[in-house]
Amino acid sequence: MAKIQFIQGVDEEAIPDVKLSRSQDGANGIAKFYFDKPTVFDVYQGEITGLYLIDEEGELSTRTVYAKFINGKPQSIEASYIMNNREEWERFIRFMERYAKQNDLSFTKAKN
């Protein structure tokens, strides 16, 4: 089961918008996650420790996570996951395929 967490042990219910970019040689890439009104704020009032992508292969994580507040209330979370080689890219794609299938999501290629 593929899941996303901001606090280990607390699953995030909001489905993110994910944008991927990759270098031309395929050696590295970045995934940018955007969560509008994430549910973590409803169940946890402490510090967000990172973005954790968990599936049967293990865990991918990043500490590059930013929360946006409007009038003192949490509104959204943005996170970036950097992949430094082809193996990390392929591992991330396997996670996203599982997460997408589980949540009935699809991939849309950007228009140039």
Curated annotation (Swiss-Prot):
State the InterPro entries in the record. Answer: Psb28_c1_sf (IPR038676), PSII_Psb28_class-1 (IPR005610)
Topology with regard to the membrane? Peripheral membrane protein
Predominantly, its location class is plastid
Keywords, sorted A to Z: Cyanelle, Membrane, Photosynthesis, Photosystem II, Plastid, Thylakoid
For this UniProt entry, what's an example GO CC term?
Answer: cyanelle thylakoid membrane
Which Pfam families would you find in this protein's record? Psb28 (PF03912)
Where in or outside the cell it occurs: the entry states: Plastid, Cyanelle thylakoid membrane
Q: Could you provide one GO biological process annotation from this protein's UniProt record?
A: photosynthesis
Report quaternary structure and partners.
Answer: Part of the photosystem II complex.
The entry sums up its family as follows: Belongs to the Psb28 family.
Q: What is this protein called?
A: Photosystem II reaction center Psb28 protein
Gene giving rise to this polypeptide: psb28
